[in-house]
């Protein structure tokens, strides 16, 4: 399973660790906040709608940040924009720790979200461009597993801070603690370079990426369906991640048991990332995503709607992490293979972050709906609808496994697959261009 890493070049390994650590940091900062929400609710007397807005606003503005970072990355390089993203969201995370009111915290979280948006699309594009097509799914899937590491660290740090410090101070220290991993990530990224694929594209006569790139009808089909797919995946994921601590608290789960439950889900997500990474290269991106989405639909329904004993809750927690979160390992390679190099991160950033911001509406939606039907029912309702939307998007997108990424040409608006230019001519099937 790790053959791809052992056979990789020094630059490929540096790129892997740079992207892995950055994604772990992104997850750490984002998930830390979800574990602080119960404390903030008590300290500032917030209602569920206000809590939902705090949880949603950073996710919504990631669309702007991701789109902007994608454009800058296509123009000025992947490596330097990855550094800028880390500095940006760490800075505003620190400032959030100094907030004196709900309104100030809302502003800092909004600005922090701009940095979050840039990390995923730019890192995914960089990885896609440096890794052998035969191993792209595995390598990018392992990068995605950094999310599980960041999540687990967030659980541990938040739990320790809330146990050792008064709640009105613990949440501030939690925001400030992001400086430590950010410094480590910046150290790792100091020698990472842009890919040869990107450099060749930048020196070619290909048109420069701009805000108008995502409006070009050549990319309309792939861009729209990719966004629909991400909306479904993110709506389900955030309905679970943001509200899970509150749900466990509502079910009177003891603090120690809550930590164990979330860690089991994080372990499940790591296993899901690894499995999805391997499967996406073995059987394809679409079958992997569809299978895990259906699995997520079933286990989420069980988790939210069934009366749970300890044993069943443990099993379902693992399976929710494995499917609902693990499936994201197949998303990075899938989207990176939809668009040509000169607009790759612009289009990926738009699809991923628009999908993320729209999908994040589930956080507010769950908060509002829970006042009428209860939190578990609200979470379950949004998750089931979300995964149905995701499957719809997947079914209408082409399979791209094994495609040589430098050969992807401009998409044909009338075709179901990207146009791929090969040494022998132009084909309209991604499968036909597999090495």
Predicted features by range, described:
Residues 1-28:
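Cytosolic juxtamembrane N-terminal segment immediately preceding the first transmembrane helix
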Residues 34, 219-273:
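Extracytoplasmic gate region of multi-pass secondary transporters
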Residues 45, 77, 98-104, 132, ...:
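Helix-breaking motifs and short loop linkers at transmembrane-helix boundaries and internal kinks
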Residues 64-100:
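Conserved MFS/SLC helix-loop-helix module at the cytosolic interface between two early adjacent transmembrane helices
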Residues 80-94, 287-302:
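Structural signature of the two symmetry-related core transmembrane helices
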Residues 108-145:
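Cytoplasmic helix-loop-helix junction between adjacent transmembrane helices
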Residues 137-158, 352-362:
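Glycine-rich segments within core transmembrane alpha-helices of 12-TM secondary carriers
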Residues 143-190:
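Helix-loop-helix hairpin linking two adjacent transmembrane segments in secondary transporters
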């Amino acid at each position: 399973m790790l053959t791809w890493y052992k056979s990789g070049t020094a630059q490929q390994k540096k790129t892997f660790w740079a992207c892995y650590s950055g994604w772990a940091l992104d997850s750490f900062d984002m998930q830390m906040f979800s574990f602080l929400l119960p404390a903030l609710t008590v300290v500032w007397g917030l209602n569920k709608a206000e809590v939902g807005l705090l949880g949603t606003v950073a996710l919504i503005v990631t669309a702007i940040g991701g789109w902007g970072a994608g454009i800058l990355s296509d123009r000025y390089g992947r490596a330097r924009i990855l550094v800028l993203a880390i500095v940006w969201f760490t800075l505003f995370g620190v400032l959030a720790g100094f907030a004196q009111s709900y309104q100030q915290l809302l502003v800092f979280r909004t600005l922090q979200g701009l940095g979050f948006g840039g990390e995923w699309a730019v890192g995914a594009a960089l990885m896609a461009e440096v890794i052998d097509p035969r191993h792209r799914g595995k390598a990018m899937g392992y990068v995605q597993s950094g999310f599980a590491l960041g999540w687990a660290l967030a659980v541990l740090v938040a739990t320790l801070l809330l146990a050792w410090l008064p709640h009105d101070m613990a949440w501030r220290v939690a925001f400030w603690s992001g400086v430590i991993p950010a410094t480590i990530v910046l150290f790792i990224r100091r020698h990472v370079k842009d890919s040869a694929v990107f450099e060749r594209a930048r020196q070619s006569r290909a048109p420069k990426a701009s805000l108008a790139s995502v409006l070009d009808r050549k990319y309309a089909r792939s861009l729209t369906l990719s966004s629909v797919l991400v909306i479904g995946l993110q709506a389900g994921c955030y309905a679970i991640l943001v509200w899970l601590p509150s749900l466990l608290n509502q079910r009177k789960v003891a603090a120690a048991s809550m930590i164990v439950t979330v860690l089991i889900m994080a372990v499940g997500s790591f296993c899901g990332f690894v499995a999805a990474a391997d499967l996406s290269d073995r059987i394809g991106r679409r079958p992997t995503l569809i299978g895990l989405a259906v699995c997520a639909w079933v286990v989420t329904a069980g988790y939210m709607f069934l009366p749970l004993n300890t044993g069943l809750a443990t099993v379902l927690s693992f399976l929710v992490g494995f499917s609902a979160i693990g499936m994201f390992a197949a998303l990075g390679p899938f989207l990176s293979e939809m668009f040509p190099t000169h607009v790759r991160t612009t289009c990926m950033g738009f699809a991923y972050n628009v999908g993320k911001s729209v999908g994040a509406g589930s956080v507010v939606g769950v908060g509002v709906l829970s006042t009428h039907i209860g939190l578990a029912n609200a979470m379950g309702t949004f998750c089931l609808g979300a995964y149905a939307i995701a499957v719809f998007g997947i079914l209408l997108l082409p399979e791209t496994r094994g495609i040589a990424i430098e050969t992807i040409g401009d998409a044909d608006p009338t075709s179901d697959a990207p146009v791929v230019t090969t040494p022998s001519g132009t084909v309209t099937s991604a499968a036909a261009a597999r090495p």
